[in-house]
């Protein structure tokens, strides 16, 4: 753990983030500021959290809270940590950790273009095959590269069809348990700028390049002996960043279905992906049957996890340097970027917390890592369920983050007098905020 902790400081120093404990001043606390022993400091944090869980908000809503000290490898605080609750977009942490564990940090999302026969002069007497790899970042430059590959081979006319291989996942367009009135993009392995209009845009680019398609567009699977003409790739880091920083739902589902594809079965389903997550849950020492994994983004109302599970995933990541590096790089930084950009500014939590937010109707969550003032690295999960407004949950979560990062000398501020709440436009909504290419 010491090597990982050293890495954590080095990485943050490279980003010029003030992650060191704040300077100590004369204390107003009962405990001495000179006593930064683990026991004394943990007592102070627990006292702060005890005061928060007794707030009136907890009388009209449900709370799940779990804080783990990674430095001492011990549970620091728990309140309702085994309650099954909807995680909202904190589900993306589970998806990300599982993907980094099973796919690796070098994994790439790949979209390929094939021909069924070798080109002859300027005529392709066979068909083109576009094989989707569920790349949510496939855009204009990628599509242009496919057309360029045809032009470089001198192809001016395609006598066959344009075949779309969408066999990486099943034919359902939306996630299991998604609300019918959510405005979410369809889930398909062949995407163009986050939309399912890949074929239309490809045909448009062919016409602009003076290439004629004589056949039709239809679905198929990749024929044996097909010839690879071009492929475009995006790294898992490129996908994880918008998935976690901006809470991009489509990126999360794309990652989820890469896990499903590990089944090696055509038309894999969400159940195939969930089975991969379940295996990691078992490795973390928990019982998969106690949870419901319905999707990768947290949009589904069928997802049920616990703060204990979320913390177990964070602990697993912290114990695996490669996973930890990729994960923490993609998580929002409190008060700096992503969905945490406007939260806890000018407080001890700013720069000292990296966490994933979550918001659904009646649910608000926050899951991630914090650096305590005594130099201990913590991980935590907070789920507020049954909250009337998003602000209620976020105010509470921000107060917890301040409680975890304040020193002995910092007055504890209750959430009912702390206005540090990001505008709802800064937070993820049920509609994914898809990345757009520049013209």
Describe these PLM feature segments.
Residues 108-169, 178-185:
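Active-site-adjacent, His/Asp/Glu-enriched structural segments that form or flank metal-binding
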Residues 192-328:
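A small/polar active-site loop signature that marks catalytic segments
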Residues 64-68, 76-78, 95, 127-131, ...:
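Soluble periplasmic/extracytoplasmic beta-strand elements of cell-envelope proteins
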Residues 292, 300-439:
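C-terminal soluble interaction/assembly domains
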Residues 73, 87-106, 162, 201-203, ...:
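Active-site SXXK
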Residues 21-71, 77-84, 148-153:
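Beta-lactamase-like hydrolase cores
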Residues 60-62, 80-82, 88-91, 106-108, ...:
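Extracytoplasmic
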Residues 1-32, 36, 439:
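Bacterial Sec-dependent N-terminal signal peptides
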